[in-house]
C-alpha cells in the first residue's frame, strides 16, 4: 500500500496562516471566511448590523439569520453580534471558559454586503455580471466586529489575530463617530434613516442563533 505523504511544511504553514489557528480571537468575512477560521472555535460570532432590505421585518430577519447559522461550520455555538451587544458576547465567552475550565476560541465573522449580480445598480457601477458573489466591505460590520474584539480584550481575552486586532483598532479609533459612520454608509443609504435608527437601537442582549453541535 502506498504511504500517504504528509503535506509539505510550506503548505502546512500557509494553511495555519489562512485559518488563524494559533490565535484565540480570529476575524474573517462571509461564509467562506467562517469556513476557514471556525476550526477549533467554541463560539462563532456572526456580525450583521443592518438588515438586507428596508422591507425585511424582525421576524423575517431572525428566520434568515437562523437559517444561515445552520449552514455555518459544525461545532461552535453561533451568536449574533451587532453594535450594541459586544459586552454580552464577552460575558458569554467568559462563562463558557469557566464551564470548560479552559480557554475558548472565538471566531468573529462579518457578514458584509451582498449585491445581486447583474442588477441595475451593479451594472451602472461598472460591475461585471459574472463576478462570483462574495461579501463586500461593510463599515458597520467592521466596526461591530471591532467592538466585540475590544470587549473580549477588556475581560482578558486578547490573543488576537492581526485581522482581529485591526478591526478592534478601527472601532476604538472611531468610537465617537460610529453612529455617524454607520448612518452615512453605503448600506444605510439603501435602507433609509428609520431602518438604520432601529438597527442602531438594537438591545444589548445575547442572541444565540445556534447551540454548539458535534463536528462532522
Model region roles, listed by residue range:
Residues 47:
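Active-site flanking residues adjacent to catalytic metal/cofactor-binding acidic residues
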Residues 42, 51-116, 120-124, 128-134:
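Acidic/Gly/His-enriched mid-domain segments of enzyme catalytic cores or analogous surface patches
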Amino acid at each position: 500500500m502506498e504511504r500517504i505523504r504528509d503535506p509539505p511544511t510550506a503548505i502546512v504553514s500557509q494553511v495555519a496562516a489562512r485559518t488563524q489557528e494559533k490565535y484565540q480571537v480570529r476575524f474573517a468575512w462571509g461564509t467562506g471566511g467562517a469556513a476557514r477560521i471556525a476550526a477549533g472555535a467554541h463560539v462563532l460570532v456572526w456580525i450583521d448590523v443592518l438588515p438586507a432590505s428596508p422591507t425585511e421585518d424582525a421576524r423575517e430577519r431572525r428566520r434568515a439569520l437562523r437559517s444561515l447559522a445552520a449552514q455555518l461550520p459544525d461545532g461552535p455555538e453561533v451568536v449574533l453580534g451587532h453594535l450594541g451587544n459586544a459586552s454580552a458576547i464577552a460575558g458569554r465567552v467568559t462563562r463558557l471558559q469557566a464551564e470548560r475550565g479552559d480557554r475558548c476560541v472565538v471566531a468573529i465573522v462579518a457578514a458584509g454586503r451582498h449585491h445581486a449580480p447583474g442588477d441595475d445598480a451593479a451594472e451602472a457601477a461598472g460591475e461585471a455580471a459574472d463576478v462570483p458573489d462574495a461579501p463586500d466591505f461593510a463599515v458597520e460590520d467592521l466596526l461591530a466586529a471591532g467592538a466585540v474584539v475590544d470587549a473580549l480584550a477588556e475581560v482578558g481575552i486578547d490573543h488576537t489575530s492581526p485581522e482581529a486586532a485591526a478591526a478592534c483598532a478601527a472601532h476604538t479609533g472611531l468610537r465617537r463617530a460610529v453612529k455617524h459612520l454607520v448612518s452615512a454608509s453605503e448600506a444605510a443609504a439603501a435602507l433609509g434613516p428609520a431602518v438604520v435608527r432601529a438597527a442602531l437601537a438594537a438591545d444589548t442582549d445575547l442572541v444565540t442563533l445556534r447551540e454548539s453541535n458535534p463536528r462532522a
